[in-house]
Swiss-Prot record:
Residues 1-21 form the signal peptide. This is Foldase protein PrsA 3. It comes from the Bacteria. It comes from Bacillus cereus (strain ATCC 14579 / DSM 31 / CCUG 7414 / JCM 2152 / NBRC 15305 / NCIMB 9373 / NCTC 2599 / NRRL B-3711). It is an enzyme of class 5 (isomerase). One of its GO terms (cellular component) is plasma membrane. It is found in: Cell membrane. GO terms for biological process: protein folding. It is a lipid-anchor. PANTHER family: FOLDASE PROTEIN PRSA, PEPTIDYLPROLYL ISOMERASE.
């Protein structure tokens, strides 16, 4: 089974289903070099896009069955799209083959439901595990342990950490800022790095820490006092939700897809599409 995309454009899906319902021999195109009938076009579309379309349709049904989306929620998303696109909004609707905003609202409902599904993966345990003090963290990343130890020795001898980061660090995203990691928070770095960082107090520098990226010398430049859990739990939850919505690995999106489609108890009755949901059996 080919790897599935989470959401695929719906316009070809609509065209394909409309044509397949016709099954007509009427010509869609006539030319000197040959004609194309509705039946031929329908067959071609089914072969190329049928599996993806069926997958998307079932995913949308599963999402909207479990996560209800109101017209008001969809309308809000449409208004956000209008503000973002400005004068291009109307032409974009036309390019998508949509007649009006109401049709766009319906198309957006599964995606809104998907956002709700991703957010629902955040548990109370996740929130508790991310209950940690706010910190500002800098680091110097190098490939080998020998170099890391040499740099740590320079830090111990009083050399400026930021200057050393600018000179030696191989993390191009932070070296120009003296090694400072923008927006450091739980769950945003690899486990070894995070555990080492949270053991440090403000002003402390770690020994070399090995991760899959290399060796890090970590410095905590600021560490806030931990606020009461009840004061920050909502913010922690929202932060985790945003992390998962923006996760580029696709881990949380795929987890949602697998769980929803498994629970849907899908049975494919058409041999042409018998392998569409085979990937669920391997999970």
């Amino acid at each position: 089974m080919k790897k599935k995309k989470i959401f695929i454009g719906t316009i070809i899906s609509c065209v394909m289903l409309a044509l397949s319902a016709c099954g007509s021999s009427d010509n869609v195109v006539t030319s000197k070099v040959g004609n194309v009938t509705e039946k031929e076009l329908s067959k071609e579309l089914r072969q190329q896009y049928g599996e993806s379309t069926l997958y998307q349709m079932m995913l949308s049904k599963a999402l909207l069955d479990k996560y209800k989306v109101s017209d008001e929620e969809a309308k809000k998303k449409v208004e956000e799209a209008k503000d973002k696109m400005g004068e291009n909004f109307k032409s974009t609707l036309e390019q998508l083959g949509l007649k009006n905003e109401d049709e766009l609202k319906e198309k957006m409902k599964p995606e809104i439901a998907f956002e709700k599904a991703i957010k629902a993966t955040v548990t109370d345990k996740d929130v508790k595990n991310n209950y940690k003090p706010e910190m500002k963290v800098s680091h110097i990343l190098v490939k080998d342990e020998k170099t890391a130890k040499e740099i740590k020795e320079k830090v111990n001898n009083g050399e400026d950490f930021a200057a050393l980061a600018n000179q030696y660090s191989e993390d191009t995203g932070s070296k120009e800022q003296g090694g400072e990691i923008s927006g450091f928070a739980p769950g945003q770095t690899v486990k070894e790095f995070e555990e080492a960082a949270y053991k440090l107090d403000a002003g402390q520098v770690s020994d070399p820490v090995k991760t899959t990226y290399g060796y890090h010398i970590i410095k905590v430049t600021d560490k806030k006092e931990l606020k009461p859990f009840d004061e920050v739990k909502d913010k922690i939850r929202k932060d985790i939700e945003q992390q998962r919505l923006q996760d580029t690995t696709g881990k949380w999106k795929q987890q949602v897809v697998n769980d929803l489609l498994k629970d849907a108890d899908i049975k494919v009755n058409n041999k042409e599409f018998k392998d569409t949901f085979k990937f669920l059996e391997k999970k």
